[in-house]
């Protein structure tokens, strides 16, 4: 919707060259915080294509700063973007004047998802926008031709609503979601970034990061066992993370305000690890951090922080 005066004082040319294709059926989107914590405006750098664009998009989806990250929502069902009728004022003679465009919303559903996933998306507490993904992997957002950046279309985040519908005898569980686009945005300002500009990655296949939970047991100075699971699973049987490595873990010493990678990580099976490290003393307060990025299609990055423990 755009309520701003955009008329240039003349009609615009209406010719269309051969080969122009519209954006396709929407099947996914990236949720993008409008601003990062440092005040910068989030966008995708599209100044270079091919592997450079692959790297730029992977870097956004796996950004270590959560306020600069893109959050993929894939495999959306029943996507619609309805727009209300415009508002007109009419005089006594029947002459109408357009006052404003109708409000545009977006609705979609997730099918067969758990309540744990629902908890991840039930509320949006920061201003955000969306970059849409169609069934071919094309992206749609607001393009800054001078700065060569693709920005999200801003959403009225206060209008965001999601609810959980239980599985029934003839229907799977569903999560219907709806929100309104910001009133100052317009379909006319959205520009497509073609899948052909990427090299090895597909926006349709880049998955979101996974949250981890930890149970830490101190063994001795410089040694712990850690049970590391995903947030998904059932009571007493969460799904274990089996991909911990030295490079993916950091031991943070809160007492000395220092951090370092472990010296050794041994997988004991089913997400249980023996982790050894140096640079700590008895009584120090420590915690464990995990962060591992996805590097290709169909991979998930992971992140999580443990609770604090006291060194033996």
Name each model feature, range by range.
Residues 1-71:
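Polar/acidic, low-complexity leader/linker segments enriched in S/T/G and N/D
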Residues 196-219:
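Short, cationic low-complexity segments
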Residues 217-236:
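Beta-strand-rich structural segments
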Residues 280-300:
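Short, aromatic- and glycine-rich surface loops/edge beta-strands on solvent-exposed regions
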